[in-house]
């Protein structure tokens, strides 16, 4: 694999992040790292067996070619790609920040990307370890997987939901699952030691809050017609509805649901149904035909940005441009407030005619300083500095077609 650099991209950001992490963890990390003589078995703060802690984000890209089954993990720190077990005929790839879930008709393959982040609120820890194949979940190509630190919820196309112990996945194995009672529309979403779901009952669908045993503990008095799409943010969980979205939050053990309406009639084909955002950000994007919806969760506002036909969209959040990969093969930057285009790259996609091919379309992955765009036919991934006029910072030449791509380590 060849890495082409246009400048040295990460040095300054890494130095700043190192300083921040050193400061934020100094108070408790230094004392915890030196156990007292009377406590020889004390575990240092942030210690994870078998993992290496780092001062900066340990980003990796999971890449898969459904045709050949070739799967790679691209380490964005070293620029090296590593092979892993092949997974053929995958139709979707989703990640929870550490694990990749490759959905096929015969099951869902779980891949531990070996890079993750632990957020302690006032500071974070970044880890890396050897990547490994975990195994198969008995869930088909249309199953939806959602995780938090404790459980992984798998909702199949028939509405049945299974819970898996995520701690077992971290040990490299899939433990037996627990089946939740009832059926559900859309994904069951773990949140604040509970589960959020739209329960099917008597021909209607209603939002419920379940405990981890599947027992209902709350039923917020809100309506959400045709629920579709979800995202976990720092301010709560967003659930897509026909007329906008619900924001579900937990406060002092109580759950509230607030409607964020579009404020206008929106045709079904222009609804926000698949949300994309930078993990940790409160600004969401969703393609909407020839435009992109931007949902500012903090301000509870929707903004529609007219762009032209959209292949993929994303943003790093407040103060950053809206990034849109369009059918001309170029990445475009837009000012969210004004809707005006501010930057544009050269065409990045080798085969523009296939750019909008459903779940196998190229994507935009975004972290705190860079964005990544996959060019399947060109066997390349581009690293974009979105704070510098969409400058191409690096390009990675691969030995596989990166049809499916997801970033871990965030």
List where the protein language model places each region.
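Short beta-strand elements that form the blades of beta-propeller/WD-repeat-like
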Residues: 53-66, 92-111, 142-163, 186-202, ...
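A short beta-strand motif characteristic of beta-propeller blades
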Residues: 43, 77-86, 118-137, 170-180, ...
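Acidic, serine/threonine- and glycine-rich low-complexity intrinsically disordered segments
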Residues: 193, 199-321
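Repeated scaffold domains used in trafficking and secretory/extracellular systems
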Residues: 42-54, 86-99, 128-150, 178-193, ...
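Intrinsically disordered, low-complexity segments enriched in Gly and acidic/Ser/Thr residues
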Residues: 291-376
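C-terminal motif of bacterial Sec signal peptides marking the signal peptidase cleavage site
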Residues: 20-24
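Blade-level signature of beta-propeller repeat domains, shared across WD40, Kelch, NHL, RCC1
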Residues: 374-410
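Bacterial signal peptide processing site
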Residues: 25-29
């Amino acid at each position: 694999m060849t890495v082409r650099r246009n400048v040295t991209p990460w040095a300054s950001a890494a130095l700043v992040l190192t300083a921040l992490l050193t400061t934020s963890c100094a108070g408790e990390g230094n004392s915890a790292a030196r156990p007292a003589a009377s406590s020889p078995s004390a575990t240092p703060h942030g210690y994870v067996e078998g993992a290496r802690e780092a001062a900066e984000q340990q980003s990796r890209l999971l890449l898969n070619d459904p045709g050949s089954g070739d799967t790679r993990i691209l380490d964005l720190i070293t620029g090296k790609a590593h092979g892993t077990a092949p997974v053929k005929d995958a139709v979707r790839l989703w990640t929870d920040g550490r694990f990749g879930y490759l959905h096929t008709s015969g099951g869902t393959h779980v891949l531990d990307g070996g890079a993750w982040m632990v957020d302690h609120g006032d500071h974070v820890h970044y880890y890396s370890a050897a990547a490994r194949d975990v195994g198969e979940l008995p869930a088909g190509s249309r199953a939806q997987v959602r995780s938090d630190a404790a459980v992984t919820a798998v909702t199949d196309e028939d509405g049945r939901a299974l819970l898996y112990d995520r701690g077992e996945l971290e040990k490299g194995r899939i433990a037996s699952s627990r089946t939740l009672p009832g059926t559900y529309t859309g994904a069951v979403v773990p949140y604040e030691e509970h589960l959020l779901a739209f329960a099917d009952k008597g021909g209607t669908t209603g939002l419920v809050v379940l405990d981890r045993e599947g027992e209902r503990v709350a039923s917020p008095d809100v309506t959400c017609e045709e629920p579709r799409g979800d995202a976990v943010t720092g301010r709560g969980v967003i659930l897509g509805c026909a007329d906008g979205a619900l924001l579900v939050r937990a406060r002092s053990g109580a759950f509230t649901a607030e409607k964020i309406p579009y404020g206008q009639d929106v045709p079904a084909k222009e609804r926000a149904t698949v949300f994309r955002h930078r993990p940790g950000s409160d600004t969401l994007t969703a393609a909407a035909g020839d435009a992109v919806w931007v949902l500012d969760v903090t301000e509870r506002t929707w903004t529609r940005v007219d762009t032209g036909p959209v292949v993929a969209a994303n943003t790093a959040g407040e103060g950053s441009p809206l990034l849109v990969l369009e059918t001309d093969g170029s990445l475009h930057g837009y000012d969210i407030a004004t809707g005006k285009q501010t930057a544009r790259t050269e065409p990045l996609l080798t085969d523009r005619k296939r750019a909008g091919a459903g779940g196998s379309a190229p994507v935009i992955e975004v972290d705190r300083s860079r964005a990544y765009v996959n060019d399947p036919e060109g066997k390349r991934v581009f690293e974009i500095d979105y704070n510098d006029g969409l400058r191409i910072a690096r390009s990675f030449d691969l030995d596989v077609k990166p049809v499916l791509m997801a970033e871990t380590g965030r």
